[in-house]
Amino acid sequence: MSFSFSQPCPSGALLLVVVSSLLLWENVASVPLSSNETDGYPLSINGLFHNAMRLTWNIKNLNMELRKTYTVNQVSEKLYENYMLDFIEDMEYLVKALTCCHNYSIKTPENLDEAQQIPFNEFPKLILSRMWAWNETSKVLLTTLRSIPGMHDDVISLAKNIETKLAELFEYTQSILNSIYGTTTTGNVEYTVFSGLEDLKSSDEEFSLFDLCKFSYCLRVDIHMVELYLKLLECVVYVSSDVCLSKNIRDAS
């Protein structure tokens, strides 16, 4: 089987992004921020962070459950055993299969030098590009699953829950960024929808399973990245940039 992929996501790049982002906070003031409103009620920045982090946790759990439920109900036992055996025995295949996701306007840095070039004012685009991409991709996934004859109801229900939680996380994330940066310029954020979900309709079980596993992997990677950036923002807001920039991180630069 041959598959097409978008840009590679090098090993260790996620850690580099997190470390490098800490190096960019020296000029960020740690000051109280204004409240936002959700559903007509005032919600403090603390509440926004709390709800956003809760949603990332919910999405990760739903994502794991989706993969498990799909595998149990839609994939033959023989194929699953063979597929997992390929992953375990062929690490090169695993890396190739599950390390390419969306193309973003701000790509994940491949080394620390690249990571340090990301300016503070690019962080909203970095986060929102991922949130917008998954908002749209989750809608495509749900539509695709609903169109497949015999698709198990539990799979569709989990996909719907993921779509709902992603939309909620997007709203909270926007509110957080608006509080920190002022009115966030979201109009210029580019995003791409995850490609290949049509393979879920394939009569070839292997194509379908691969597509679902790739979707699940890429969602996990991006939600983890958003979660880490939110933790960084929360640290700077409530503590200080000096504390968030530990001596070890300064020395590592």
From Swiss-Prot:
Q: What is its main location?
A: secreted
Q: Could you give a GO molecular-function term held by this entry? A: hormone activity
| Residues annotated as signal peptide | 1-30
Task: Indicate yes or no for the key word Signal.
Answer: yes
Answer yes or no on keyword Acetylation: no
Query: Can you tell me which residues are glycosylated?
Result: 36, 103, 135
Q: Give disulfide pairs as residue numbers.
A: 101-218, 235-244
Q: Which tissues express it? A: Expression restricted to the placental tissue. Expressed only in the spongiotrophoblasts.
- The molecule here is called Prolactin-7A2
